[in-house]
Amino acid sequence: MPYFSDKMTFFFCQDEIGKSFATIEEIKIWEENEIMNIWIIFIGFMILSWIVSMTLKSKFNKYSKIPLDNGMSGREVAEKMLRDMGITGVKIGSVEGQLTDHYNPADKTINLSREVYEGRSISSAAVAAHETGHAVQHAKAYAWLGFRSALVPAVSFTSKWVQWILLAGILLVRTFPALLLAGIVLFALTTLFSFITLPVEIDASRRALAWLSNAGITSYQNQQMAQDALKWAAYTYVITALGSLAALLYYIMIFTGSRR
């Protein structure tokens, strides 16, 4: 009886070990498939981002050739919107480059690209009003803008190092997994920043379009064009946020896979 008992135990152990190896192989195959899926999604977002970026430039170039009915420049549009909103202490300046327009809450300046600053087109009016919309958000203590502004110093520092930390973390994931985990935490911060940016940009466009219409800056046809231009600008932020999320999931997959 002991002989048969030992033999049964031996075969049972063999069976369990076989099942364990099968399970490990299944996990590896699943991980490889998931990582491949994440890569496909990531590459898809890169292609989509390029398409949206090219479309955005095409839209702005198209609408930059259509003059605003009242002939106002981007600077004049921004100045009038600030006056109408009762906002003071905000400076309007010109910066070099295309689509480099932005509002800086740190020094309360609306920075418009030269084309927008001097331009008297639909594009110039839409962009100038959008950036002024950020100044309105700041003046009215819009919560999401406050959250984003609070994250700017940390994200600015993180963005300089996160890719190097992630690269080193992936190379050393088996021996020093904590490095990759640190990179994931830092990258998660930039992903969070991308998603917080969405409501900020969408709200600024909403304020801009409402004011352009209510103030009589744009006719009905002009308004549709301005809305189209700002819609495509918003798409770039959506794609950026989703692409960042896909990359974050990819890094998490690598980390969790190394722990098995």
Regions found by a protein language model. Give the residues of each.
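Post-HExxH zinc-binding segment in Zn-dependent metallohydrolases
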Residues: 152-176
